[in-house]
Structure formats: C-alpha cells, structure tokens
C-alpha cells in the first residue's frame, strides 16, 4: 500500500504524511511545474504542466490497494476502477455508492459554468475537515477498505 497525493490542490498534506509515517507507508506527492513542493518524508514527483497532467500520471501509476488523495471526482472514479481507494483532502471517502452522484453534480456544474452561470465556491477548510481526514485515512489504512466515513 502506498499513498499517492494530487499535490496541486491538497491541503492537509502534513496530516497525511504524519499518519503515513506512523504506519510506515510510502507517500508520493505528484505536482506540476507550477507548484514547487518539498517534503522531508514524501517523494515529490514533478510532472510537466498541462491540462490534467498530474491526474493522468496518478491514474497511470496507481496500483491495487493504494490510497489516492484527490479533490477530482474523475480521478477518484478511475482509481476505484483499478481497485485502489480514494479519499478527498477533507476526509470524505469516495466509493462506488457515491461516484455516480458526484460525477453527475460535476457535470451539471460544468454545464452551468459554460452557459455563463456561477456555482458556489468551495467552503474554507475547518478543524472538522482535518479530523475527518485523519480518522478516515486511518480507517482506510487499518482496514484496507472498510467504509466508516460520512457520506456526501
């Protein structure tokens, strides 16, 4: 098991690294050339910048049993198809039961934006988000994939 992080947009990296360190799990953070990241624990892999370049590298590198941390529903859907686990940086676990709803909401939001409409901005990160990430990531690690998180 490894933890692969979409580092272009992942608050909470320090929480993930601390849990991984405690459990002796390799962490790989992927980012593009527009984001310079450093870590004392994780391996940082920088890829060329481009539309979804980090996402595609993660999908190509993920293995069965890995955990992927990403805000992108499309990435989550693809890694679930590869028998890996996916969790949002706010600690929500992606699973087969919520992917259709999330992907449909993403589709509707993109349609609204294309027609000039506005969608809501993401909410600011809270201490509850940190707690949820810590608890649910730990559950994924301990149990492989026993879903005990909150649904969306």
From Swiss-Prot:
Belongs to the UPF0178 family. PANTHER family: UPF0178 PROTEIN YAII (PTHR35146:SF1). It comes from the Bacteria. InterPro entries: UPF0178 (IPR003791). It comes from Clostridium kluyveri (strain ATCC 8527 / DSM 555 / NBRC 12016 / NCIMB 10680 / K1). This is UPF0178 protein CKL_3490. Transmembrane segments: none annotated.
């Amino acid at each position: 098991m490894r933890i692969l992080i979409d580092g272009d947009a992942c608050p909470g990296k320090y929480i993930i690294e601390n849990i991984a360190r405690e459990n002796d799990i390799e962490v790989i953070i992927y980012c593009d050339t527009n984001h310079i990241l450093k870590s004392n624990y994780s391996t940082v892999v920088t890829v060329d910048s481009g539309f979804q370049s980090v996402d595609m590298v993660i999908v190509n590198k993920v293995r069965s049993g890995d955990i992927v941390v990403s805000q992108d529903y499309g990435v989550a859907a693809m890694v679930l198809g590869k028998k890996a686990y996916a969790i949002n940086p706010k600690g929500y676990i992606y699973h087969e039961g919520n992917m259709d709803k999330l992907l449909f909401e993403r589709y509707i939001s993109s349609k609204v934006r294309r027609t000039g409409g506005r969608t809501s901005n993401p909410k600011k990160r809270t201490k509850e988000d940190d707690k949820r990430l810590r608890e649910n990531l730990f559950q994924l690690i301990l149990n492989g994939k026993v879903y005990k998180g909150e649904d969306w």
